[in-house]
A protein has these predicted regions:
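Extended catalytic core of nucleotide-activated donor transferases of GT-like folds
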Residues: 43-44, 57-59, 95-183
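Aromatic "clamp/platform" in nucleotide-sugar-dependent glycosyltransferases that forms part
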Residues: 321
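A short helix/loop element that forms part of the nucleotide-sugar donor recognition site in Leloir-type
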Residues: 107, 207-224
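Conserved donor-binding/catalytic core segment of Leloir-type glycosyltransferases
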Residues: 57-60, 225-244, 250-254
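Short hydrophobic beta-strand element within catalytic cores of glycosyltransferases
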Residues: 338-341, 357-358
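Nucleotide-activated donor-binding/catalytic signature segment of Leloir-type glycosyltransferases, i.e.
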Residues: 278-307
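N-terminal pre-catalytic "stem/leader" segment of glycosyltransferase-like enzymes
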Residues: 2-119, 124
């Protein structure tokens, strides 16, 4: 019986404490197992016994709507488009994580018993990474090349990740920021294992007219006026409310468009997993009650998927405090949407995108009421909402000009 089932026997008022310590104890046993088997596991390095044409195995939480899940889906899709031999394995249910729609062509964890040794790219952070690692059959994990694909959002990685790194032949990361964090954390003889492999998000090849028609169609489907100026942001409470920082988006929107300039402007806040931090839901609902231009969209219930969400928008505004990569930023920009975002440690391919507009920031100490980022000495950005509001207002003014005309540079 797993610790997630035992909780039913625990009195309700003690369950939060039970979960806190049960997870710590379980993770401690996993770390101990790594210590005990470390010599056996690392002895296989350089002895990858598989044919050079063996298919790459991409492992991840494919049915999860999270950024880590999307990273696995993007890699699998890119390899297929490049006509590489590749298999995909969804481990969402194997790890007891919430998931959604199963993807056609993706195997489940039972496939590990039949798959032959190969290059295995695992899109999971610790502690999920090592939990899955020991679910691999010994023959598979000891004769394969194991690559961890990690994402992290702070300059300092948790110290325990160093132990997990010993199980990997290589570590891939989506950005220079995550590479910087990993290099600081890892022992010197492991640093050479780190490679920056950005997510591949296809860029639209539609003309401006086709983009306009797509926007018009999306707005018609969901009841939005085609002449409205619509700003949007999408985030998950499970990705930490204070890091995603949607309140700053509200403030910047309201500064850009005061109440006497009410007509035809809307702010769509698309969120997921509100149950993770109910206090955050109350904060958003209070703001929406005071300003009916703010529309809250619960992604767990709404029929508006991410592609339609981007197509509805004039501007995607992310005033996050930190991002390991920022998949939604590049997805929006590559669909032809203007993106206003915090300029701190942007991934190069995002920073260089013609549709991305950076705003200024200052560094502050991490303050996370959800207690996810318990890393001593960590910092993140405090985005300048005045700068964001000015650039948002300028984009609005430009949207009213004849096509192709611009005001003064936004940078």
């Amino acid at each position: 019986m797993s610790y997630t089932r035992i909780y039913r026997l625990v009195p309700p008022h003690l369950r939060p404490i039970y979960f806190q310590y049960a997870k710590k104890i379980k993770n401690l046993f996993v770390k101990l197992k790594i210590k005990i088997t470390e010599k056996q596991e690392t002895a296989r390095r350089g002895k990858n016994n598989f044919p050079p044409n063996a298919p790459v195995i991409v492992v991840g939480i494919f049915s999860s709507p999270t950024g880590i899940g999307q990273g696995a889906r993007l890699m699998w899709d890119k390899m297929r488009k490049d006509r590489r031999l590749v298999e995909a394995v969804d481990v969402t249910s194997a790890l007891g994580l919430p998931g959604g729609k199963k993807l056609e062509g993706v195997l489940d964890e039972r496939a590990f018993q039949k798959l032959q040794p190969s290059t295995i790219v695992v899109h999971l952070n610790p502690p999920e990474f090592e939990k899955l690692y020991f679910k691999f059959p010994k023959k598979l994990r000891r004769n394969s090349k194991i690559i961890a694909y990690w994402a992290w959002e702070l300059e300092i990685m948790p110290e325990e990740w160093r132990i997990t790194a010993k199980l990997c032949d290589e570590i891939w990361v989506p950005s220079d920021f995550v590479a910087y964090s990993a290099i600081k954390m890892l022992e010197k003889n492991y640093v050479q294992k780190i490679t920056v492999v950005p997510h591949h998000v296809a860029k639209t090849n539609l003309s401006n007219f086709q983009l306009l028609m797509r926007k018009k169609s999306a707005r018609a489907r969901y009841g939005f006026n085609e002449d409205d100026f619509i700003v949007g942001y999408s985030f998950a409470f499970s990705s930490v409310f204070s890091r995603k920082n949607p309140i700053a988006v509200i403030v910047a929107f309201q500064k850009a468009f005061s109440s006497d300039n009410f007509q035809g402007k809307k702010l769509l806040l698309r969120y997921r997993d509100g149950h993770v931090w109910p206090h955050g839901i109350k904060l958003l609902e209070n703001e929406a009650k005071k300003d009916n231009r703010i529309i809250l969209i619960n992604a767990n219930e709404s029929k508006i998927d991410m592609d339609d969400f981007y197509d509805i928008l004039n501007v995607y505004m992310s005033l996050h405090r930190s991002e390991g990569y920022g998949i939604t930023l590049i997805e929006a920009a590559n669909r032809g949407v203007k993106v206003i975002t915090t300029g701190w440690w942007l991934a190069k391919d995002i920073e260089n995108n013609e549709n991305v507009i950076k705003i200024s920031w200052k560094l502050i100490d991490v303050d996370d009421p959800q207690n996810v980022y318990n890393v001593c000495g960590a910092r993140w950005a405090d985005p300048d909402v005045n700068d964001a509001s000015q650039k948002l207002h300028m984009l609005y003014c430009e949207s009213k000009l004849p096509s192709g005309n611009k005001l003064l540079p936004l940078e």
